[in-house]
């Protein structure tokens, strides 16, 4: 939130959160599931606009919710190799959303400093993907460690009008971290390593 030509002061948001989950753990396996329902009053959500210095702006929406399930699982394949997975399926909605778009002069695109109300109805909250999934494969042996991480994020809308043209496409990225730890006289341990981000150059 920041001041702009339309002087609007934000309200404090209120959240009622219900969650229920279960976890399991053994020497080789871990697993868990968690269900949640988050009911908001006057939630502050991004609206796709930028303020005078380029920061994302937010607005209050009177009635909204986030609900979903979080899943996690892990397996110790060997003493030196482990694989962990987690993912969140969610539904993030605004009820009876009314948004406002700025009006511009058709020929010059000069800002007219007026707005038009757009009744969207029920819509997806901006920057709220319906699925996020992560994978971590970790290797540790005789001082050498490697970690290969991957993440998938589903489509994210830049504002609350749910237009595909104003959205980020789903993406899948992977990173690789390598490290080696060794000892020297009078030194407890030295670790050298490197990380390659977006190793497959996904765009």
Placement of each model-derived feature along the sequence:
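Residue-level preference for beta-strand/loop junctions
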Residues: 14, 27, 65, 129, ...
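Membrane-embedded beta-barrel scaffold of Gram-negative outer-membrane proteins
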Residues: 9-60, 65-67
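Extracellular loop and loop/strand-boundary signature of outer-membrane beta-barrel proteins
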Residues: 3-9, 17, 54-60, 68, ...
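Gram-negative outer-membrane beta-barrel transporters
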Residues: 37-40, 59-160
């Amino acid at each position: 939130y920041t001041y702009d030509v339309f002087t609007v002061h934000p309200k404090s948001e209120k959240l009622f959160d219900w969650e229920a989950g279960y976890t399991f753990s053994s020497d080789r396996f871990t697993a868990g599931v968690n269900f949640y329902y988050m009911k908001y009053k006057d939630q502050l959500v991004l609206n796709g606009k930028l303020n005078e210095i380029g920061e994302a702006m937010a607005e209050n929406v009177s009635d909204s919710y986030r609900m979903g399930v979080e899943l996690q699982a892990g397996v110790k394949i060997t003493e030196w190799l482990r694989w962990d997975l987690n993912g969140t399926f969610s539904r993030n909605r605004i009820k009876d959303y009314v948004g406002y778009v700025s009006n511009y002069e058709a020929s010059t695109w000069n800002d007219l400093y007026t707005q038009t109300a757009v009744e969207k109805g029920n819509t997806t909250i901006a920057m709220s993907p319906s699925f996020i999934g992560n994978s971590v494969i970790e290797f540790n042996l005789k001082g050498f460690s490697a970690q290969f991480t991957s993440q998938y994020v589903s489509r994210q809308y830049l504002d609350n009008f749910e237009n595909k043209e104003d959205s980020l496409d789903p993406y899948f990225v992977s990173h690789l971290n390598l490290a080696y730890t060794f000892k020297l006289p009078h030194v407890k341990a030295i670790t050298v390593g490197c990380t390659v981000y977006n190793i497959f150059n996904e765009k």
